[in-house]
């Protein structure tokens, strides 16, 4: 019981030091989802007024049907996989949170301070790692729900978009954890900020480089590879 209470107390104290990350994450995801949804719907609303006066340009589609179709498309652009900015944002957040969460290891004073605490290193690592994930998880989830509410308030049935929205959310969280874990490993293996960034670049590029090397070697040394690709 004491160990559990200490763990959550450490999480709370660490989160206080990450308030800047919490605020920044909430703000950036607010612009990426709820704000994007509201601005997109406002733009469609102006088009809708024009369609009521001048027609939609489609004989078989009325203004209301076209408005609904465009809002549905907007849902995918904001909450789905089509939102490229959201993917970039998640990746950038993973790198920043992974880097800043464990930079204390590069400071002798901070390391001495944490070593003086009656806390196991494994527990301290778990606190830092989990807090970094929760910052992104909470910011994404809160703003996703806000954007979802905006769409539902504009005539979109929630059941029709929940599956797509949750699929994108789960995929982004898995991607975040992978990028985040690699950055944390880079920080643990190196000794300063600049080398950590370089190390992360090497780790991020390792798998693509191996994949590219294998494909090139196949083209050079395996004749059937080129033939199979041509036949396909």
Model feature map: region roles:
Residues 104-134:
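Helix-loop-helix units of permease transmembrane domains in multi-pass membrane transporters
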Residues 17-58, 85-96, 200-210:
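Hydrophobic alpha-helical transmembrane segments of multi-pass membrane transport/permease proteins
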Residues 47-82, 224-232:
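Long, glycine/tryptophan/cysteine-rich extracytoplasmic
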Residues 73-76, 80, 130-191, 195-196, ...:
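Secretory targeting signals
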Residues 6-11, 119-127, 190-199:
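Hydrophobic, small-residue-rich membrane helices and short re-entrant helix-turn-helix hairpins
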Residues 1-24:
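Aromatic- and glycine-rich beta-strand/loop motifs that create alpha-glucan
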Residues 14, 104, 112-116, 184-189:
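Helix-loop junctions at the membrane interface of multi-pass solute transporters
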Residues 80-110:
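Long, hydrophobic alpha-helical segments
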């Amino acid at each position: 019981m004491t160990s559990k209470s200490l763990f959550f107390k450490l999480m709370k104290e660490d989160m206080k030091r990450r308030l800047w990350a919490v605020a920044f994450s909430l703000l950036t995801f607010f612009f990426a989802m709820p704000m994007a949804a509201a601005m997109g719907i406002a733009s469609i609303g102006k088009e809708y007024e024009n369609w009521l006066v001048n027609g939609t340009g489609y004989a078989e589609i009325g203004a209301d049907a076209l408005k609904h179709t465009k809002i549905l498309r907007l849902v995918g652009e904001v909450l789905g996989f089509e939102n490229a900015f959201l993917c970039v944002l998640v990746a950038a957040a993973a790198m920043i949170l992974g880097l800043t969460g464990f930079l204390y290891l590069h400071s002798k004073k901070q390391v001495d301070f944490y070593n003086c605490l009656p806390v196991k290193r494994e527990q301290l690592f778990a606190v830092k790692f989990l807090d970094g994930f929760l910052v992104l998880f909470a910011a994404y989830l809160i703003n996703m729900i806000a954007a979802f509410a905006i769409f539902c308030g504009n005539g979109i049935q929630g059941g029709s978009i929940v599956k797509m929205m949750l699929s994108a959310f789960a995929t982004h969280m898995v991607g975040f954890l992978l990028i985040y874990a690699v950055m944390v490993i880079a920080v643990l293996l190196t000794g300063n900020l600049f080398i950590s960034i370089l190390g992360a670049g090497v780790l991020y590029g390792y798998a693509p480089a191996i994949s590219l090397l294998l494909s090139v070697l196949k083209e050079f040394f395996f004749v059937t590879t080129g033939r199979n690709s041509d036949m396909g």
